[in-house]
């Protein structure tokens, strides 16, 4: 494998292995899985039984679309911590959707809600004296020593953050781009919705607007690891 360097230019992407090799890799993994099942006596080796059942509800109360995929159809998986927005996450989610469509599989994003947040501040670009600067806008009072799935968001702070962002950028078009934030605020008001679910609701809303559809979503905290480890 060559030495990899993170791209520095605007809009540049790094793929390894090259994207054109991905369908062949999916097929190779599928064959290996079937061969392993045969060697082990044909046991059902699904590592994620939850994928074959009704998945947890979305933050807005509607159920996530359940994944009912047969043993020989691939599930293309990506994942990341729950953050308000992250270009790298969107790129990965768009790519797994494209790859899943190409190989007849299902695209799945794992929400890593068991990690603690690094910050409760949005980095917002602003122009000061004709020069680009970055302002910090606090959107929550999250603890950095506690998993996101164990915390909740305050709707008043979320609304205040949206107003501050618009006041900072001084650009109506960019303010309209904050429309997905309404999904975060709405989700945060749902009983039992944790911070990771609420933040993910905004990302999911943005992806639905851009793609017209969304990937399957599962939170890591809800995966049945105990059952998997017993197999």
Task: Report residues per predicted region.
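N-terminal regions that are enriched for targeting/export leaders
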Residues: 1-82, 132, 156-170
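Generic structural hydrophobic/aromatic packing signal, biased to beta-strands
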Residues: 56, 76-78, 107-110, 137-139, ...
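Short active-site-adjacent helix-start/loop capping segments
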Residues: 66, 84-87, 116-120
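N-terminal catalytic cores of NTP/NDP-binding nucleotidyl/phosphoryl-transfer enzymes
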Residues: 71-103
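Compact, glycine/acidic-enriched structural inserts
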Residues: 104-173
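Aromatic-residue-lined binding/catalytic grooves and analogous aromatic/hydrophobic interfacial grooves
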Residues: 172-231
